[in-house]
Regions:
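N-terminal subdomain of lithium-sensitive/metallo-dependent phosphomonoesterases centered on the IMPase/IPPase/PAP
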Residues: 1-107
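Residue-level signal for inorganic ion chemistry
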Residues: 33, 59, 70, 110, ...
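Generic detector of well-ordered alpha-helical packing
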Residues: 60, 83, 106-109, 140, ...
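DPxDG-like acidic metal-binding loop motif
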Residues: 95-155
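Detector for glycine-centered tight turns/loop "hinges" at secondary-structure junctions
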Residues: 130, 162-164, 255
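Short helix-loop capping/hinge motifs at secondary-structure junctions, enriched
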Residues: 153-166, 273-278
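An extended, acidic
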Residues: 169-289
Length: 289
C-alpha cells in the first residue's frame, strides 16, 4: 500500500472503545480534578512559561491517569499530553508522522481552575497524520461532553444522564450580529491595536481562557466564531473536528487546512463558510509582515 493511500485510510473507534475513553476521563475528574477544585494549596500550583500559564498537581495526576488508560487501550498509539510536552517539547514533532496519536489537555483552563472559576474542562483528541479523527470536550463539573468522530455523521452532546442531542452551529449574520472569541494577547504587539479596533464591528467579544468551553459554545450555536493566534494541538484538535461536524468551517487564516502538527499561524473557526470568508477578509492584515 502506498504512503498516500495509507494516509487516507480512516480509523474508527467501536462504541465500547469510545465509552472506555470517556470512562477514563470521568475517573480522572472524580479522582484528581474535582477533589482539588477550590482546595489547592499554594505549593500545588506552579508557573510554567508565564505568570498566567499555570500547572497544578491535578493537571499532572489527571494527565498521568488518562495517559495510562489510553496506553492500555491503544498500545501502539503515540500519546501526547500538554504537561508531557512541557517537559519534552520534541514530542510535538511526531504528530504529523503518527498513524494514530492521542492528544490530551488534562485541565483546559488551568488558570481558571487554579483561581476557583468553574470554566474549565478536559480535552482529548485523536489524530491520524495530524488530521483530527476523534474529539471530546468534557465538562467535569456537569459530567457532560461533546463528541465527534471522523466517518460518523454530525457531532453530539451527551448529558450526564446519557441523554443525547445533535449539535448545530449558528447561521451567522451581519458583522454587528456576530458573537465571537478573539484572543488579543495572542497577536504580536504591533498588531494588537488594529485588531482591537475591529472589536466594535461585532455584537459581542469574549475570551474565556478555556478552549474547551469556547469550542462548546461555538458548536452549539451560542457563538459564531473564534480567532486564535496560538495553535497548541491540545487546545484545538478536538474542537476543530467537533465544530466541523456540527456544520462549522475551520481553517488556518491563510487558507491552509488545519493540522495538529501546525506550530504557528492563526486559526479561524466559524459557524459556516460564508461567515469564515467575511472574517478572513477582515483579519487578513494579521498575515502581512
Amino acid at each position: 500500500m502506498s504512503e498516500k493511500s495509507d494516509r487516507s485510510d480512516s480509523v474508527s473507534f467501536p462504541r465500547q472503545i469510545a465509552d472506555r475513553i470517556i470512562q477514563a476521563i470521568r475517573l480522572a475528574a472524580q479522582q484528581e480534578i474535582l477533589p482539588h477544585f477550590r482546595a489547592l494549596q499554594p505549593e500545588q500550583i506552579a508557573q510554567k512559561s508565564a505568570a498566567l500559564d499555570l500547572v497544578t498537581t491535578a493537571d499532572l495526576a489527571s494527565e498521568a491517569l488518562i495517559t495510562e488508560a489510553l496506553s492500555a487501550l491503544f498500545p501502539d498509539a503515540l500519546i501526547i499530553g500538554e504537561e508531557a510536552v512541557a517537559r519534552r517539547p520534541g514530542l510535538l514533532d511526531n504528530i504529523e508522522s503518527a498513524p494514530l496519536c492521542f492528544i490530551i489537555d488534562p485541565i483546559d483552563g488551568t488558570w481558571n481552575y487554579a483561581n476557583g472559576l468553574a470554566t474549565f474542562g478536559v480535552i482529548v483528541a485523536a489524530t491520524r497524520f495530524g488530521q483530527p479523527i476523534f474529539g471530546l470536550l468534557y465538562d467535569p463539573l456537569q459530567d457532560d461532553y461533546m463528541i465527534a468522530e471522523q466517518g460518523v455523521e454530525g457531532a453530539g452532546f451527551v448529558a450526564s444522564c446519557g441523554a443525547k442531542k445533535s449539535l448545530k452551529t449558528s447561521v451567522g449574520g451581519a458583522l454587528n450580529q456576530l458573537n465571537g472569541f478573539i484572543h488579543l494577547y495572542q497577536v504580536p504587539a504591533p498588531k494588537q491595536a488594529r485588531l482591537a479596533a475591529c472589536l466594535p464591528h461585532f455584537g459581542n467579544m469574549s475570551n474565556l481562557r478555556c478552549s474547551c468551553h469556547e469550542y462548546r459554545l461555538l458548536a452549539q450555536g451560542s457563538f459564531d466564531f473564534c480567532l486564535a493566534g496560538i495553535v497548541k494541538p491540545w487546545d484545538h484538535a478536538a474542537g476543530v473536528l467537533i465544530c466541523q461536524k456540527a456544520g462549522g468551517y475551520v481553517k488556518m487564516l491563510d487558507g491552509r487546512e488545519y493540522s495538529a502538527a501546525h506550530k504557528d499561524g492563526y486559526l479561524l473557526a466559524a459557524c459556516n463558510q460564508a461567515t469564515w470568508n467575511t472574517l478572513q477578509e477582515l483579519f487578513a492584515f494579521l498575515l502581512t509582515p
